[in-house]
Amino acid sequence: MEKLTLTPISHVEGTVNLPGSKSLSNRALLLAALAKGTTRVTNLLDSDDVRHMLNALKQLGVNYSLSEDKSVCEVQGLGKAFAWQNGLALFLGNAGTAMRPLTAALCLANADSVPAEIILTGEPRMKERPIKHLVDALLQAGADVQYLEQEGYPPLAIRNTGLKGGKVKIDGSVSSQFLTALLMAAPMAERDTEIEIIGELVSKPYIDITLNMMKIFAVDVDNQNYQRFVVKGNQQYQSPNIFLVEGDASSASYFLAAGAIKGKVRVTGVGKNSIQGDRLFAEVLEKMGAKITWGEDYIEAERGELNGIDMDMNHIPDAAMTIATTALFAQGETVIRNIYNWRVKETDRLSAMATELRKVGAEVEEGEDFIRIQPPASDQFKHAEIETYNDHRMAMCFALVALSNTAVTICDPKCTAKTFPTFFDEFSAIATV
């Protein structure tokens, strides 16, 4: 296995232009494919997840052209639901942002033509990532979805019986991606859909991204305080002609944290008016003691005396991981709460984070839905080999350990290709050893 050792970094300074957001990229491609008209998607992320979505759309008969650097994609919208030849199988890797929305969108296919089945599968880890809450909701809306192996998990078989709509209940407590998938499919259902949320809805800012994007593609949703969503049926998405993908606010977190710990770093491509909830990560850094400056198209973090915090971070689950490694450089303990959904991501992130933080010298308590971190003294960091569990965010979070007086070795550094293939190049560009 490839390993990368980062030597201790004494200072960071510079500007990082962020790659496009993964969740925005894949939502934009899917909406563009379903919409009427041609959409030019710009600042598209070039990563594994996006490649899986593009491959799937091509197999589903969507025509698109991709620029040489893969940052611009011109998509010819179908203006209707997908259709396919019986027996088609789509391999979606470990891309939750492709698997969930496509599962719902494929249920729209109508059997006016010949009955046809499609199979959605992926890497072994994908078969461990729950999808039951989404499938339960789709079944209530009249879809025909079956599990091919373990109940509640991919791979799935979907038949083209159409999506009727009607009253649907969905559990909101595990992942907002299930609701996002259902919301994006609902306007093209035969009838109006009324979605009732069971339990506390997690990651609300991700739902705001979805609703915002649907509006750009000419569909409005009646959001009743995140408890109920009413979507009119039989609608058609309309191309906005151009859709600019914002820089990835989750990816911004590593560089902003580095600035807060040891220098001054500006990230561009995301700013104070961003539609991504993870921009709020900068406010958490500010609470800890960093100096933050907000621009229209940038956020800047400057070193401050950092103190530990105790905070519910359900609203920024991906960026909250970066707080866990930032906590190594704060005075006193940090507690990150209400993050059960870390357990159903690319790996069980709660368990992985606790294990790897202990290796570098922290005292850690791992709860069912929280993590408590007591940092090591500044001269007590240990050189460790960090397992990354094929999880891009683990690799990027633990790069911050190099801001101590101790080197850190990252196993399988190329796993960052899921969202940020050039991460380590960008990180070394702002670092002074």
Curated annotation (Swiss-Prot):
Binding site for 3-phosphoshikimate: 22-23, 27, 175-177, 203, 318, 341, 345
Catalyses which reaction(s): 3-phosphoshikimate + phosphoenolpyruvate = 5-O-(1-carboxyvinyl)-3-phosphoshikimate + phosphate
The keyword Transferase is annotated on this UniProt entry: yes
Keyword Ribosomal protein: no
UniProt-listed InterPro entries: Enolpyruvate_Tfrase_dom (IPR001986), Enolpyruvate_Tfrase_sf (IPR036968), EPSP_synthase (IPR006264), EPSP_synthase_CS (IPR023193), RNA3'P_cycl/enolpyr_Trfase_a/b (IPR013792)
Annotated metabolic or biological route of this protein: Metabolic intermediate biosynthesis; chorismate biosynthesis; chorismate from D-erythrose 4-phosphate and phosphoenolpyruvate: step 6/7
Record protein name field: 3-phosphoshikimate 1-carboxyvinyltransferase
Taxonomic source organism: Mannheimia succiniciproducens (strain KCTC 0769BP / MBEL55E)
Gene: aroA
